[in-house]
Amino acid sequence: MNEPQYHSLPDELSVLVSQHWMHFVESGHRIPDALLADLPRVWAGSDYVAAQFQRDPGLGEWLLASDLSQALAASSLKEEIRTLLAQCDSEDDLKRALRRLRHRHMVRIVWRDLARIGDYHSAVADLSLLADTLIDEALSVLYGWACERSGAPLDPDGNPVRLVVLAMGKLGAHELNLSSDIDLIFAYEHEGEIEGERRALTHHQFFVRLGQQLIKALDQTTADGFVFRVDMRLRPWGKSGVLAIGFDAMEGYYETQGREWERYALIKMRPMAGDLQAGDRLIKRLNPFVYRRY
């Protein structure tokens, strides 16, 4: 394995990259020669990227195979994430898989940025797409497990009711940056009960539990780190509000108690995971509050 040419960097950065390289070599991992030209610039700019190369033995080959010249493609990203998550048999497996995917794609996004392959706009777009896809696929797995345990929530016509995850703030505007929390709201379209073997479970209870599991999968710090910090405080009634809210209750809240700042916040709201069609219907119901006619 050849050594990157980091000696042309300013002295302080050259020392930093040489230390990273020494630790990398000691780890016994290898990196494709095709990445060595950009490595000094990237590792000088990101301790995080250098650390990930020391932790993940397959990162270099994966990064090269990902075609760094191209921004993330939604279809291939979804396929990659879905394939890996399908192998998970427990919540611990799911957490490990999500964190591995997150770390690898964060490295890819930072590499493209620092190596001047992509620009700022492609970086924030890729970050937002990554968040959307990780959350949607994680939710799909958790929803399936929840339905296996307690049965599926159904609407009056017998169709499954799914959680709607609404993105707010920077994620809602597709402007997520490397240090952003993600602002979310959980909602569902129909109230009802799931008839179980022991006792009935309300849709509200089902979706609150599902939301808690999703937050735990994303936000909990494990040995592998975390996926995203989740902030739910923009939901109706803020921290004192229910974690998942029905469409009727949500519409009633904004009609009777919605404040001026909440109207501005809802401008960036968009359905980003779960039942996107139901989310679009919710947006239409809330539009009279957001865009009032005076």
Stretches with model-predicted labels:
Residues 1-294:
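A nucleotide- and high-energy phosphate-metabolite-utilizing enzyme signature
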